[in-house]
A protein has these predicted regions:
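Catalytic pocket-lining loop regions of alpha/beta-barrel enzymes
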Residues: 1-101, 128
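Generic hydrophobic, helix-prone segments enriched in Leu/Val/Ile
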Residues: 82-87, 110-117
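Mid-to-C-terminal alpha-helical segments outside catalytic/metal-binding sites
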Residues: 95-100, 112-152
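Glycine-rich, Trp-frequent "lid" loop and neighboring beta-strands that shape
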Residues: 107
Length: 152
């Protein structure tokens, strides 16, 4: 499958992270699985959904080290504390350009998603790092089709 996907320049979207289903197997939804695939198929474009919640730190590590691996930010504003930490880490590790906008529609509209992301950018606590407005601007406005080498 991955050989053909890479050869045909397909994009793989992984639903990474938690599931509310008691039957869901979390061992197969961890971001490090995508790292393994990326090492074996470095030309394969992959996207991890939801910043890999609850494994956002691992998601940042995977997108940092693998050229063709990205993450989407869908639903990250719904857990502002987790979204804040993930975006601060993305800034510190210079991988904000590898984060794609997503709303998790139909659960949330793009408008609600964008408003939620800017609310995270407004969070401040003492001298702690914060999510820059420019980071949210970049995520919301960048051309994902070009990043993923897709045409409209």
């Amino acid at each position: 499958f991955f050989i053909e996907a890479q050869k045909n320049e397909l994009v793989i979207l992984w639903h990474v992270g938690a599931t509310p289903s008691p039957h869901g197997d979390l061992s197969i939804s961890h971001p490090l699985i995508i790292d393994d695939v990326a090492r074996r198929f470095p030309g394969l474009t992959q996207i991890m959904a939801h910043l890999g919640h609850p494994w956002q730190r691992e998601t940042m590590a995977v997108i940092r080290k693998n050229r063709r691996v990205f993450a989407d930010i869908s639903a990250s504003w719904a857990r502002p504390f987790d979204g804040y930490h993930a975006l601060v880490r993305a800034q510190e590790w210079s991988v904000t350009n590898k984060i794609l906008f997503g709303s998790d529609f139909p659960l949330w509209t793009p408008k609600v998603a964008i408003e939620g992301l800017y609310e995270i950018a407004n969070l401040r606590s003492g001298n702690l790092p914060y999510v820059r407005k420019e980071t949210i601007d970049q995520i919301v406005n960048q051309d994902a089709l070009s990043m993923l080498r897709l045409s409209a």
